[in-house]
Regions:
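Alpha-helical transmembrane segments and immediately membrane-proximal extracytoplasmic
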Residues: 1-441
Length: 441
């Protein structure tokens, strides 16, 4: 009897040890997948409400987009400092300086990211949910440190890194991209002991996401470009140059606001961010109406339509979307640039298709999508893998890789890394820098 009790006690201790070593982490990864799916549905619901309002009264964005912008920035400034913008620079900053984790990866920040980005998409802002999902995943996993009896800075960093990678993978349904993103963008190094942790988190969160949403391709399947064609080479070169320059200029504009913004507007942004956000909302509404509504939101529908060859867009779509994204990000509202960047890239491919018929529109759109995303993030491998996994365009692997690499190199001649420059500003500032502050963007 006593031996049976000893065995039972030993088994209980083993179960507790297994839970302490693995259970907390697995639970966190499952929660990341669950929250990512709910957040995606939440954002989609918000944009459907916006589209319904615009269908009822096409002029309505002129009223509620500026008011919503002012409300969103007011709430962010007062309650959710650190939730501004994409969220990826914040995650990078915490991985490089663990002292920032409690400020930038808290559950309060996660809540603010979800709520304020919902307000933004509800008002038609040009923002995506993928970047915020990275910070949401990192914040949620970082909170799981409380489940460990003895936490450490190493454990906290591993949790945040795994949560960020799992968040991106769940947002795009691109498991491989989650691992590559963590290695190339978040840590800028390959550490073998991280890979098991990353893959485990991505598996658990991915299973939850697939269970709730089913197996799907983010942008569907694009028509194949049959075999290699010499006509693809000049298109590839032109796409690389156009997207590399456009992505580099985008980063330069956001990182050097003080150099180009008129002084009165610059001072308004610094001293009265809520008023500045109101005017950003006016700009977004005007651009949206000028584009007949195509620049509102993330741009997912427009990009997918171009990839499937059933969308007709203005040659100026990419330029108008570019302006709407600049205004959205300068306002300081929580929201990502991944999906809007893909939409801008697809728009550039649409413009290229007007001057050449040798390459199908879906192929041009895919090339410009990967090129522009790579130029903005300066993470060519991540960009190539994301687009490749999202569109099931395996027949275009080599061209996508080439464009991503060339566009990144061109972008680097114009501006430094967008995310890492912002992360450096978070680290070097003695206080939390809001993106509405000129010191942070």
């Amino acid at each position: 009897m006593f031996s049976r009790l000893r065995i039972s006690h030993r088994a209980e201790r083993r179960v507790r040890r297994l839970w302490a070593n693995y259970g907390v982490f697995w639970l966190g990864a499952v929660l990341v997948g669950l929250v990512s799916v709910v957040y995606a549905k939440f954002i989609d619901f918000g944009f459907e409400l916006f589209r319904g309002a615009v269908a009822y009264a096409s002029w309505s964005p002129l009223i509620f987009t500026p008011i919503g912008a002012a409300l969103a920035i007011g709430l962010t400034q007062k309650f959710f400092r650190g939730a501004e913008g994409s969220g990826i620079p914040q995650v990078i900053a915490t991985l490089e300086d663990g002292r920032l984790s409690s400020s930038l990866l808290s559950l309060r920040i996660m809540l603010g990211k979800i709520v304020i980005s919902f307000v933004g998409i509800l008002c038609g802002f040009t923002i995506g949910r993928e970047g915020p999902t990275v910070q949401i995943g990192a914040s949620l996993m970082y909170a799981m440190r409380r489940g460990y009896r003895r936490s450490s800075q190493h454990i906290e960093r591993q949790l945040a890194l795994a949560g960020a990678a799992a968040g991106l993978a769940a947002a795009f349904n691109t498991p491989l991209a989650g691992v590559v993103f963590a290695i190339e963008e978040l840590t800028r190094s390959f550490v073998s002991r991280n890979t098991g942790t990353l893959i485990t988190a991505i598996i658990f969160s991915g299973v939850v996401a697939l269970g709730l949403q089913g197996n799907y391709l983010y942008f569907g399947r694009i028509p194949a470009f049959n075999g290699f064609a010499w006509a693809l080479i000049p298109a590839l070169i032109v796409a690389s140059v156009i997207t590399g320059v456009a992505g580099g200029v985008f980063g330069w504009i956001l990182l050097n606001v003080a150099l180009w913004m008129p002084r009165p507007l610059f001072e308004l942004r610094r001293t009265h961010p809520v008023y500045f956000a109101f005017f950003c909302g006016v700009a977004i509404a005007v651009i949206g109406l000028a584009s007949r509504g195509t620049t509102f939101g993330s741009g997912y529908a427009e990009a997918r339509g171009l990839l499937e060859s059933h969308e007709t867009l203005s040659p100026l779509y990419a330029l108008l979307k570019f302006g709407a994204l600049i205004a959205s990000y300068l306002s300081g509202i929580p929201g990502g640039i991944f999906a809007p960047s893909l939409a801008i890239g697809a728009g550039l491919g649409n413009t290229m298709s007007l001057v050449t018929s040798s390459v199908p529109l879906p192929s041009l759109a895919a090339l410009c999508m990967v090129g522009y995303l790579a130029a903005v993030t300066q993470s060519p491998i991540t960009s190539f893998v994301i687009v490749m996994e999202m569109i099931d365009g395996h027949q275009m692997v080599m061209p996508l890789m080439a464009v991503a690499l060339l566009a990144t190199q061109i972008s680097r001649t114009i501006t430094p890394s967008f995310y890492h420059t912002l992360a450096h500003r978070f680290r070097s500032s003695s206080r939390l820098p809001a993106l509405s502050s000129p010191s942070s963007i």
